[in-house]
Amino acid sequence: SGLLMNFGEQHVNVAQ
């Protein structure tokens, strides 16, 4: 969860 792609969470959350 973040601006583009956060590689620090369990799942890659892409927020527009």
Swiss-Prot record:
It comes from the Eukaryota. One of its GO terms (molecular function) is alpha-amylase inhibitor activity. Keywords: Alpha-amylase inhibitor. Inhibits insect alpha-amylases. This is Alpha-amylase inhibitor DR1.
